[in-house]
Amino acid sequence: MENPSASRDNKGFCFPDIPVEEMDGWVKNLISEEDMFSSSSTSELMNFESFASWCNSPSAADILFTQYGLSTSQSIIPFGGLEGSYACEKRPLDCTSVPRSLSHSLDEKMLKALSLFMEFSGEGILAQFWTPIKTGDQYMLSTCDQAYLLDSRLSGYREASRRFTFSAEANQCSYPGLPGRVFISGVPEWTSNVMYYKTAEYLRMKHALDNEVRGSIAIPVLEASGSSCCAVLELVTCREKPNFDVEMNSVCRALQAVNLQTSTIPRRQYLSSNQKEALAEIRDVLRAVCYAHRLPLALAWIPCSYSKGANDELVKVYGKNSKECSLLCIEETSCYVNDMEMEGFVNACLEHYLREGQGIVGKALISNKPSFSSDVKTFDICEYPLVQHARKFGLNAAVATKLRSTFTGDNDYILEFFLPVSMKGSSEQQLLLDSLSGTMQRLCRTLKTVSDAESIDGTEFGSRSVEMTNLPQATVSVGSFHTTFLDTDVNSTRSTFSNISSNKRNEMAGSQGTLQQEISGARRLEKKKSSTEKNVSLNVLQQYFSGSLKDAAKSLGVCPTTLKRICRQHGIMRWPSRKINKVNRSLRKIQTVLDSVQGVEGGLKFDSVTGEFVAVGPFIQEFGTQKSLSSHDEDALARSQGDMDEDVSVEPLEVKSHDGGGVKLEEDVETNHQAGPGSLKKPWTWISKQSGLIYSDDTDIGKRSEEVNKDKEDLCVRRCLSSVALAGDGMNTRIERGNGTVEPNHSISSSMSDSSNSSGAVLLGSSSASLEQNWNQIRTHNNSGESGSSSTLTVKATYREDTVRFKLDPYVVGCSQLYREVAKRFKLQEGAFQLKYLDDEEEWVMLVTDSDLHECFEILNGMRKHTVKFLVRDIPNTAMGSSAGSNGYLGTGT
């Protein structure tokens, strides 16, 4: 008998003609027909007085009336246009209806599941089911007349959702929407904020923004057998969520209670020893590449298939299945995250697989060629199901390549590298890709690329395979990381990613996937480069190391900027002549201090071979600013550097920088001692020590050294100054004279102290009066060379849009005092900012210690300038360490 009060009203979920007690009993009797429901718990959960706070919509009555025969089904008008389904847009209204559900048990299960989920969930959530209905000859997904839970703040969005229908069949509609995609794929899809979708990907975008919708997740609902998807449960929140792990757990528990389930992440099969070896090498390669090129993250994708194990549990089996399309899943243990902020993206990839052809990974799997995208954010979600997460984390360019390992035969591995997010220029991306290819060639031992013939025949690696190892000059092992330079020009190395060219700059933004580079395109790229840049080799550059960079650029016929770029391609981070001048200044400073020591006739000479001070007869030596190293000093310095080189047991890797911040990993070079005129002996000996990357940990390839490498000439300066300070205070210092050895008073014992902190500051006793006097003499000596020069410098510090100007004595003020002066003028907290000065190469250099400050003053002195510019930069709170002191200064105070 039809209930006369079953008509709809617009006053929410209420029944004015039926008492609540009677309605509660009616629901209890209906649900008690199912053995799986407990009548006692159902009475409590289905109490409409408590349920009314969640269901505050006119359609709440439709859920019960329509499903249980209290009213006839009513026609609905589909919501056409862009915001609705395209499949039913032009159909007559009288042909479209929402028929009564064929299975009451499924509706009851969903209603019960929502009741259980209500216990676990919090506020600010809309939960609604989408089920397939037949509209004409097609099946569409609709949430009208389906169970739902509602927070009053999302009532408007619920009403808008009732007017939408989405395609329930593949290839039926170009825009299936979020519920349609999940129903077709059977895989959950979520986003922390719907703003990361495009309007065509989330058809209810306008209504979501109007109702302040943020997070959203759609979950497929499967029958107990798990064979097919019968509905989609959509959860919508009012706040942005980093993930939906808690909600997923609650939904799984609620569905299991009513004999339903959802798709879960399959358990990984046990790996064989060969698979473990291959994955371990992939992990080491990805880690080294990310460190060398400063990549935010790199992922390892493996084709796999699903099979049912014990207790009908899905098991992920690695390897391609010829009977069905392979699914690509990431292997978490082999991925590497260099930027910890990207961990959320890796977690999202763990929850979602890719099919063949999806994203650059799927394209690399089927093409056997590297696949590149200049911006993965421009993908459509159907092309790349993880695009909304890529947009959230701001990922930009990426490249993927398919490899195979000799350990596992024809098993494929897809390595996906994400380029730095700040690198957006096509030329910069191309340079980094070329550099990345060279790095891969040196790192891989058993990994090789796959040719088309191997992919078809399934045979072993043939001659067409691009061998990425088999390089006798470079050896890589898991326990150690020892490399040497290839005896070839870096530019001649064949690039694995050379198929991707920067001559298609206009096509990169719009095209995705594999870009096949033709020979003509490569030639056009070379034409854009100057002929000088192509022909300048390392041997040619070495001939100009003794002069200045500007003179070398003029001789080579290029501008200084181009020459710097050429140097970075060869791993030269700073022009050597500047380093030589720095050594000259250091040695002159040492000799001036030695000459000022009292109590010794003639003076002192520092022997870098023995590390001792030798007294000599009276001598006069002029320290002209344009004098170069004498032959004795050069030999002594070379011997001293050679001694210090013997203490290095692990050879560091050199970092080569390219335009746009790209970094290239290169091996240490051994140059010929019989080099051409003007070349230096072992110029790479000191260049390689400038790198901040030292792979010295046997168990952690690519780990950064805990201590920053110190310049060798700075070490020499520290030893000399420390010894002079001890000699000035009457400490134990042996002085050799022509007729014997004189040993001063041994009453005070001390030892030379070297700095062990990362800043490389000189740790000298501040109570040494003789050292203070020596520095004053140095200042007098330096100032005497310039007529009319002042002993004070003008400081111009800029913080944001403000600039202050003040004077200081460069030989009295230390780094900590300079920081205090700047903090006082800008009213900043000490330790909350950092200073950078503008050097002679127009680059901003960090000012951290007193040695940095002295270096700054020496540069100004060489440039004949009396004004220094400082840039004040804020330091994030997370970067402030307690070991640096309260003011963030890493040096020693006075």
Curated annotation (Swiss-Prot):
Q: Does the keyword DNA-binding apply?
A: yes
- Where does the UniProt entry say this protein principally localizes? nucleus
Give yes or no: UniProt keyword Secreted.
Answer: no
- Coiled-coil spans in chain: 578-598
Per the database record, which ranges form the RWP-RK domain?
517-603
Q: What keywords are annotated for this sequence in UniProt?
A: Coiled coil, DNA-binding, Nucleus, Transcription, Transcription regulation
Any one Pfam family here would be GAF_NLP
Bias category Low complexity: which stretches? 747-763
Q: Which InterPro entries match?
A: NLP, NLP1-9_GAF, PB1-like, PB1_dom, PB1_NLP, RWP-RK_dom
| Highest rank taxon of the organism | Eukaryota
What is one cellular component GO term in this UniProt entry?
Answer: nucleus
In its UniProt record, a GO molecular function of this protein is: DNA binding
- Give the start-end ranges of region Disordered: 732-763
Subcellular locations according to the entry = Nucleus
Residue intervals of the PB1 domain? 792-875
What is its biological role? Probable transcription factor.
Kindly provide the name given to this protein in its UniProt entry.
Protein NLP9
Q: Which organism is it from?
A: Arabidopsis thaliana
Tell me the lineage of the source organism: Eukaryota, Viridiplantae, Streptophyta, Embryophyta, Tracheophyta
